[in-house]
């Protein structure tokens, strides 16, 4: 009687699931071993560490520096993007969930809203402008930098 409540669909007698649970790790391990045997183990090729430039040698250094703020914004974007995809099922079933679903949604959104407020207060998503504030257009920029 207890087995019916623990395994209501008769999983303990299903040979397909047991076969799957054994076969998948075996195939994964075999593929990893084959990959290890076939691959070239020498890392002496200097081109592997350089950037790939569509098959031609670059005329200048291709690894230019850029601000870490862009990476930070991309990392901060991820939780809020996942938040949006997690809210979508709620919008489809809002009629069935009633007030209980609303409390679950608020419990889910509250830490994200607090985190967003903290990010704004710490100015984690603030990007400084690189150009001079006195420059109004491209022509004045060229005149300003004496490139006429």
Swiss-Prot record:
Keyword Methyltransferase on entry: no
Transmembrane segment boundaries: 19-39, 70-90, 99-119
Domain of life: Eukaryota
Compartments (UniProt record): Mitochondrion membrane
Catalytic class of the enzyme: translocase
Main localization (coarse): mitochondrion
Family matches, as Gene3D superfamilies: NADH:ubiquinone/plastoquinone oxidoreductase, chain 3
GO cellular component, one term: mitochondrial membrane
Entry EC number(s): 7.1.1.2
Molecular function terms from GO: NADH dehydrogenase (ubiquinone) activity
Keyword annotations: Electron transport, Membrane, Mitochondrion, NAD, Respiratory chain, Translocase, Transmembrane, Transmembrane helix, Transport, Ubiquinone
Catalysed reactions listed for this entry: a ubiquinone + NADH + 5 H(+)(in) = a ubiquinol + NAD(+) + 4 H(+)(out)
Record's bilayer topology term: Multi-pass membrane protein
Family: Belongs to the complex I subunit 3 family.
Functional description taken from the UniProt entry: Core subunit of the mitochondrial membrane respiratory chain NADH dehydrogenase (Complex I) that is believed to belong to the minimal assembly required for catalysis. Complex I functions in the transfer of electrons from NADH to the respiratory chain. The immediate electron acceptor for the enzyme is believed to be ubiquinone.
Listed name of the protein: NADH-ubiquinone oxidoreductase chain 3
Originating species: Wickerhamomyces canadensis (Yeast)
């Amino acid at each position: 009687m207890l087995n019916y409540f623990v395994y209501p669909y008769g999983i303990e007698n299903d040979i397909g699931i047991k076969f799957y649970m054994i076969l998948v790790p075996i195939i994964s391990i075999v593929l990893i071993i084959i990959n290890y045997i076939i691959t070239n183990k020498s890392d002496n090729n200097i081109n592997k560490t350089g950037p790939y430039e569509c098959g031609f040698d670059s005329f200048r250094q291709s690894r230019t520096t850029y601000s870490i703020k862009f990476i930070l914004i991309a990392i901060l974007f991820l939780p809020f993007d996942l938040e949006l995809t997690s809210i979508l099922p709620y919008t489809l079933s809002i009629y069935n969930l009633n007030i209980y679903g609303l409390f679950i949604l608020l419990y889910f959104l509250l830490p994200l809203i607090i985190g967003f407020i903290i990010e704004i207060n710490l100015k984690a998503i603030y990007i400084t402008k690189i150009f001079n504030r006195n420059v109004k257009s491209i022509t004045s920029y060229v005149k300003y930098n004496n490139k006429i």
